[in-house]
């Protein structure tokens, strides 16, 4: 996986819409009529199940090619994929979440180097490469995360006597972010807030923001420095002080006492931010839907990178994907061809583009979506970051973390540290040494 993501991803899609869970099909996994082949897509995203099924029907009505869509229940995709791939009529299109997922299914991934979906990518460095350098996965959802900020609260702060900045545009490094957050925390009564940052909750609905997304930042810089592009057997003790500094900022300049973080949820943090109780909130482009529903206006929020003091001057937002299309190399040539034609139609036809960008609310990396406008202010900021030639987007290297258990152990160590029941050395141990433990267990 290429370390840089400088090329513009293009104008991206609207915020995701939640829909009821469904798992349904239509058509057969057989070769189809007239040698056209057929398509069987095992979908990973339950929230988009209905939309995929409707889109499959549209394609069948238009082309006569049978398309079956089946959606795995949340948290069961790997298990269901294993079961379905063992059947005679196996999925022709399936998904992996990145390099670790690829290792599980690399015996089934066709070469997509010459495919239209790969050729239509704005930034081909985002594609997933196999062990031999071939393209084995094409991302169809691109997302960005960082520190979301309330423009109104920041503006109110800059108007105070002695404010350390005159504009949010001056927050371009960790040192400035810390000075602003520390000062806001001291003057929270003047600002009408409860803390500079929303609660860093470690309930399961929120802990991924820290054990995965925040931990990704020091991991990214380590992998960038050592030119690591595939999951390593071990990692080094690098940038741990930087990791500690940003986490300390989150839990010190906060709306919530450290002793209460274990029970704080993702909804708590979202609500605190939407109600103006905090100026800063670590999350991503997907958060806009909930914030908008809570009454926030598009012109009142923005997003900046998670600065940790390594290469702040050139750091962009954390941009990547956990959703890669793969074509099953074990099915017939006719079905492989039919599957690639279906995906080409999905990203190029008006019906397909509308389904992805509006109905499913996906942010897409294809040139065919460059004319798609968005009213999501966080995606607008992501576009600016991606299109800024002076910035390098932070890769989603957490996709190379060896296991879910690795993340859980790290998260527990971070919570213990935050609550005062553990020390930072335990976090370093969970981050560095447990990587090798979990990698060895998986291999």
Segment roles from a protein language model:
Residues 113-127, 166-170, 201-204, 219-245, ...:
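Short, solvent-exposed loop/beta-turn-alpha elements that line the ligand-binding surface or hinge
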Residues 136-140, 145, 175-231, 278:
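Extracytoplasmic/periplasmic solute-binding protein
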Residues 66, 255, 294-361:
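Extracytoplasmic/periplasmic substrate-recognition and gating elements
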Residues 71-80, 172-176, 260-275:
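Short helix-initiation/N-cap motifs at beta->coil->alpha
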Residues 179-182, 226-263:
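Glycine-centered hinge/linker elements that transmit conformational signals in sensory
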Residues 353, 364-366, 370-374, 388-443:
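Conserved C-terminal helix/tail region of periplasmic/extracytoplasmic solute-binding proteins
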Residues 97-155, 209, 302-305, 375:
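Hinge/lid segment of periplasmic solute-binding proteins
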Residues 4-14, 21-101, 117-119, 310-312, ...:
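Conserved N-terminal structural module of periplasmic/extracytoplasmic solute-binding proteins
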């Amino acid at each position: 996986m290429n370390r840089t993501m400088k090329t513009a991803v293009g104008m991206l899609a609207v915020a995701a819409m939640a829909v009821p869970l469904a798992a349904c099909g239509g058509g057969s996994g057989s070769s189809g009529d007239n040698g056209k082949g057929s398509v069987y897509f095992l979908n990973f995203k339950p929230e988009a199940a209905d939309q995929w099924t409707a889109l499959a029907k549209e394609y069948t009505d238009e082309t006569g090619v049978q398309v079956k869509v089946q959606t795995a229940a949340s948290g069961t995709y790997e298990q269901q994929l294993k079961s379905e791939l063992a059947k005679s009529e196996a999925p022709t299109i399936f998904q992996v979440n990145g390099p670790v997922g690829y290792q599980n299914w690399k015996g089934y991934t066709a070469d997509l180097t010459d495919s239209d979906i790969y050729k239509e990518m704005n930034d081909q460095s985002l594609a997933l490469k196999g062990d031999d350098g071939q393209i084995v996965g094409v991302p169809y959802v691109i997302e960005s995360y960082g520190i979301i900020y309330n423009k109104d609260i920041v503006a109110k702060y800059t108007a105070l006597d002695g404010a350390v900045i005159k504009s949010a545009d001056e927050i371009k490094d960790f040192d400035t972010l810390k000075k602003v957050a520390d000062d806001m925390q001291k003057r929270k009564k003047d600002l009408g807030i409860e803390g500079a940052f929303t609660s860093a909750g470690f309930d399961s609905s929120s802990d991924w923001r820290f054990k995965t997304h925040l931990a990704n930042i020091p991991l990214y810089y380590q992998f960038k420095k050592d030119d690591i592009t595939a999951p390593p057997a071990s990692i080094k003790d690098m940038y741990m002080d930087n990791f500690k500094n940003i986490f300390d900022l989150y839990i010190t300049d906060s709306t919530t006492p450290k002793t209460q973080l274990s029970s704080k949820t993702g909804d708590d943090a979202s609500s605190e931010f939407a109600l103006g109780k905090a100026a800063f909130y670590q999350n991503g482009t997907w958060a806009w839907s909930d914030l908008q529903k809570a009454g926030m206006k598009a012109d009142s929020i923005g997003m900046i990178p998670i600065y940790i003091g390594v290469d702040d001057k050139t750091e962009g937002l954390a941009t990547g994907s956990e959703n890669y299309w793969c074509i099953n190399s074990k099915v017939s040539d006719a079905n492989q061809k039919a599957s690639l034609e279906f995906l080409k139609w999905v990203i190029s036809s008006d019906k397909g583009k509308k389904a992805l960008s509006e109905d499913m609310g996906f942010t897409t990396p294809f040139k065919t979506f460059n004319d798609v406008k968005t009213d999501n202010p966080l995606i607008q900021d992501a576009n600016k970051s991606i299109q800024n030639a002076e910035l390098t987007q932070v890769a989603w290297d957490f996709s190379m973390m060896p296991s879910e258990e690795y993340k859980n152990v790290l998260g527990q160590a971070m919570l213990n540290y935050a609550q005062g029941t553990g020390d930072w050395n335990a976090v370093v141990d969970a981050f560095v040494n447990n990587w090798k433990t979990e990698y060895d267990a998986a291999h």
